[in-house]
Amino acid sequence: MSSASNLARIALSFGLPAGLLDRGPALRGTKFLARAALKARFGGRPFQMVNVGACDGALFDDVTPWLHRIARARAMLVEPIPYNQKRLRANYPDTGRFIIEPVAVTRTRGTITVHTFDAAALEDGTLPIEFIGCSSVTDSNLMSGKNAWGEADANFNKFAPHLKDIEVPSETLQTLLDRNGVAHIDAFLVDCEGADWMVFDQLDLKRYRPGMIK
């Protein structure tokens, strides 16, 4: 996206009326990010994002792409699925500012089984591309053949053959933050398909006090 387009988006974000913002947390988040983008143009401490379960940092994600709009922004992007890691690095190629941790966040260091989908089936269109964001360490409805209401999913047999379990390394959240020298957090994002609390529960809110949590 061009610099002019980014400036236009930031300006429009600041133009959102307070009454509208109060009706939508997502819009308040947009204004927070726009303010960060404006502040970054005048120097100061670099904006720091931590995203656990980053997927590819683009698909169905309205927050992580702001890293490209906020000058000098930095991020620790945690993503355990190899297929997603490749897409994530392609979308955020600056290795100096955007650190990818190829692990899952757990309460103890080790390895963990992740339920996921075959990368080839995603790549050739056999499976919907949105399935790249559905990997989980829990037995989510999708992985168990149930729909959003917990009832048997009639379409489960179409994608069940492409389900697989993989072993990935796991680490505690604080270890990752310390390893990457994360001293402050402006935006903290978690999307772990049913295991979100395992991550949130480890964040020291008094220490980091993120301005945005999603």
Where are each of the predicted segments found?
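Phosphate/nucleotide-binding beta-alpha loop and adjacent structural elements of enzyme active sites
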Residues: 2-214
